[in-house]
């Protein structure tokens, strides 16, 4: 039974589908997830705590037995999962989405300056994530695997602290893009490209939140 004192991030770790419920009411389960459900709900307007708990417990009861929960993977298997489920899809989506973001800014930016700022923020987000993921793959993840195998990694805490700091900066850029787009709600006059960009940026936000949560609250806890 999920209760009001349970930590938001822990609930998502145990029941990954709970992320959808927290997201629907604007509760951060990612970098800001180390608070109780009650505390998180009090920060949001129009969130009924009892209703939220009911929805969360419905998810708990319908959790599919035998379905993969990454928290049960060891460090090396979890890293492989993260790379396959998040790193590669994110790289592919950045490659495919960037031309549309550029086109939207170029065509509609002169009359809607916030679209120019959106592109600049997206570029910062994209470049930062690509660099971050490459460093994880090449440098940081191998250190975590060595640590799991019993080798001495003197800077393991620094590695984790630096990655968490990167994640916080990433979260701030996601908030900025959401604010610039009114939570990815296109205006009535929006063309097809405009709507496509907003839709895919929103999906990118969801994917990134899940990605960061898995690293911050599952992977890093296994080595700290």
UniProtKB/Swiss-Prot annotation:
Highest taxon in the source lineage: Bacteria
For this record, the Gene Ontology CC terms, alphabetical, are:
cytoplasm
Q: What gene does the UniProt entry assign to this protein?
A: scdA
What this protein is reported to do is described as: Di-iron-containing protein involved in the repair of iron-sulfur clusters damaged by oxidative and nitrosative stress conditions.
Q: Does the keyword Metal-binding apply?
A: yes
Report a single Gene Ontology molecular function.
metal ion binding
Organism phylogeny: Bacteria, Bacillati, Bacillota, Bacilli, Bacillales
Q: Name it.
A: Iron-sulfur cluster repair protein ScdA
The UniProt subunit note reads as follows: Homodimer.
| Pfam families the record matches | Hemerythrin, ScdA_N
- Subcellular location field: Cytoplasm
Q: Does the keyword Metal-binding apply?
A: yes
Disulphide linkage map: none
What's an example GO BP annotation here?
Answer: protein repair
The family annotation for this protein states: Belongs to the RIC family. ScdA subfamily.
Primary localization: cytoplasm
This protein's UniProt keywords: Cytoplasm, Iron, Metal-binding, Stress response
